[in-house]
Amino acid sequence: GKCFREDGVNEFVEKAKTADGFVFGSPVHYASASGMITSFLDRAFYGKSALFQGKPGACVVSCRRGGASAAFDQLNKYFTINCMPVVSSQYWNQVHGNTPEEVKQDLEGMQTMRTLGNNMAWLLKGIEAGKAAGVSFPEREPAQKTNFIR
């Protein structure tokens, strides 16, 4: 399948075929990820979820006050529902600033981002080393659909 809208999702899906891992980011609006990233990920993952399986995923959120953990959780669900290893850091993957200069002043957030990058690189190297040693990602069982109406 292909999304009928021609706004970048299909182009992203093509690039996702050869990607080793993913980092998605969003500002926090009303304690959730932006509607734009949510719509984008809904469409990309719904149509081509198999492309993402086994590839590490991480998300980064940006906010000043509450809502970071809710948005972080919302974005991580795309990874966990699609059998993707989730890359973590030393805290929620959160940083704040309205400009690049302001973000650089968020010392804790910047450290969290560096740790996230290091952890992503380590996991990608580990996956490659595993493949070279003959260890592959577990084969998925056929999905079982539960219907409580019998």
Give residue spans per PLM region:
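Helix-loop-strand module that forms the ligand-binding subsite of alpha/beta enzymes
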Residues: 4-91
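Glycine-rich phosphate/pyrophosphate-binding loop and the adjoining helix
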Residues: 85-150
